[in-house]
């Protein structure tokens, strides 16, 4: 079983940007856990989707029914209404600060040793703080980074 912190980091590492809304499926099967931990928050739904059309795809507008937890669109192939679960077009925003705070607590960085300037390179490098080196009075900086 993978740690939720590691699963979230892997999901972040596969995203092109962290400052844009993201489809729920990009977070994998753990996305509900990420919502509960407030690492991601709902940010609405897509208004258009790509659907099969002959040997290609076509963009169509969707009608969202939040109360019924579904969306629908008119199929360009046969004109019938297609109904799908709303989760398929749910968008989320990333709350990177919440995840970084939880990660700092997990690895045991004391509150007074947490960084006041966390973001070093936007969307790529963060300074969590200073971690005590075991058995000494020395501290080492702790950074987390993701690929370009």
Tell me the role of every PLM-derived stretch.
Residues 133-148:
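Extended, non-transmembrane interaction/recognition domains
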